[in-house]
Amino acid sequence: MSRRKPYTLYAMLVLSALWIVFFLCAPYIAPFDPETTSVADRLQDISSTHLLGTDQLGRDVWSRILYGGKASLGIAFTIIGISGAIGIVIGGLAGFSTPRVDRWLSRLIDLVLGFPNMVIAIAFVGIMGPSITNVIISLCITKWAEYARITRGLVQIERHAEYITFARMSGASNLRILWRYILPNVLPPLVIVIIQHLGDAIILVASFSLIGIGVQPPDPEWGAILLSSRDFLQTAPWLLIYPGLA
């Protein structure tokens, strides 16, 4: 039986790749060093020299947005990669194991999902101290369960397919069936979910930085940029508008 080609997945991958490459090329695109200050150029409006103006220390806003995107992507990829790997492993085991193992792992997944992610993450960072490392750990602790639940459901659907029955009849082990046959079929929808969650992770990281417990100024990260510019909403609104739109 032929499967439809995942054109939606391909389109999302291409668009996401272009967006990611754009910000990863920040060192080659940015016209200025994001950390270079110039008191004489502070709080300048849009000009041919500074496309999005300058901040309170004379730093180029466009350059800081580009470097902030690069930093935000790196942090988000770390969170999605770690939590996704944990969730896929646990979800795969839950969906393919015995009913008893599935029951216990499902309870663990439901327990984690039962608590608000932000509340747990903020509490963890509040106890451990504000740092981007603690933000990453806290979000990995809370987000893996989302991928585990999705993976479990997809694996349970695939495990009853005819080709799995034929694989069992041919003598394939459970590990080989899971790795060789099931995972390749459940990964495409998981990739779409991960791409969608990449934006969520960026917003969460920026939110932590904005309330002062994530990336700390003067590091160029979108939330940290907004945090350092919050006092200039009336005198230099571009300092918040453009990073906020990014």
Feature-to-residue mapping (PLM):
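Transmembrane alpha-helix signature in integral membrane proteins
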Residues: 61-96, 245
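Short membrane-interfacial helix/loop motifs at transmembrane-helix boundaries
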Residues: 27-63, 212-213
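Glycine-rich helix-loop "coupling/hinge" segments at transmembrane-helix boundaries
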Residues: 124-127, 154-155, 204-246
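Hydrophobic alpha-helical transmembrane segments in multi-pass membrane proteins
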Residues: 71-87, 114-122, 184, 188-205, ...
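Short helix-to-coil transition segments within interhelical loops
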Residues: 54-59, 96-97, 166-185, 226
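N-terminal signal-anchor/first transmembrane alpha helix
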Residues: 1-32, 108, 187
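Generic hydrophobic transmembrane alpha-helix motif, especially the helices
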Residues: 51, 55, 95-96, 101-157, ...
